[in-house]
């Protein structure tokens, strides 16, 4: 057994983006094959395609919540209840991390060096020791998984 939060960090360290790392740690509960989850989350890393908008971990949290308790019938009450739940997840994430925005999370919490590109172009950074050292992403990934487990009543333990 291992913790989902550790699984997510392991995925990030293997080169998956932040959104893929979080979503990949929940494949067993959302009913997705790993490759399917990786494709779905592939667009959301780096704050949506590295544009530094909403944090990819948040996108993954909201996808998991939608798959587990989202609405399917176009009914105002169900939609409102779901949106209220997602907003509560977002508010909790923001309270714990200071922002939902990738750029703000990187700027306020990272110790970026001149050798690490924090830009918003489409070119992916090489994953180096400096890349991981300069970013708060691992702790944010861990927190997003723990928050998702808490708010959706999912155990943090997973079969490895």
Residues covered by each model-derived region:
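Phosphate-handling active-site elements
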Residues: 29-39, 65-88, 156
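RNase III-family endoribonuclease catalytic core
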Residues: 52, 78, 93-94
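C-terminal binding/interaction regions
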Residues: 86-160
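Glycine/serine-rich anion-binding loops at beta->alpha junctions
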Residues: 16, 44-63
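Structural signal for hydrophobic packing residues in well-ordered secondary-structure cores
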Residues: 12-15, 26, 30, 48, ...
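Polybasic, low-complexity association/targeting segments
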Residues: 1-14
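Acidic-glycine-rich active-site phosphate/pyrophosphate-binding loop
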Residues: 25-43, 115-121
């Amino acid at each position: 057994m291992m913790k989902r939060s550790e699984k997510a960090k392991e995925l990030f360290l293997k080169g998956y983006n932040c959104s893929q790392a979080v979503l990949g740690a929940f494949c067993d509960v959302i009913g997705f094959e790993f490759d399917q989850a990786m494709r779905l989350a592939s667009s959301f890393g780096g704050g949506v395609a590295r544009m530094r908008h909403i944090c990819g971990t948040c996108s993954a949290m909201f996808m998991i919540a939608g798959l587990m308790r989202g609405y399917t019938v176009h009914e105002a009450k169900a939609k409102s209840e779901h949106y209220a739940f997602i907003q509560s997840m977002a508010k909790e994430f923001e309270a714990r991390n200071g922002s939902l925005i990738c750029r703000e999370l990187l700027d306020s919490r990272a110790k970026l060096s001149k050798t690490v590109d924090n830009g918003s172009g489409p070119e992916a950074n090489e994953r180096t020791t400096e890349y991981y050292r300069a970013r708060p992403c691992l702790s944010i990934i861990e927190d997003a998984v723990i928050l998702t487990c808490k708010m959706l009543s999912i155990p943090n333990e997973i079969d490895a």
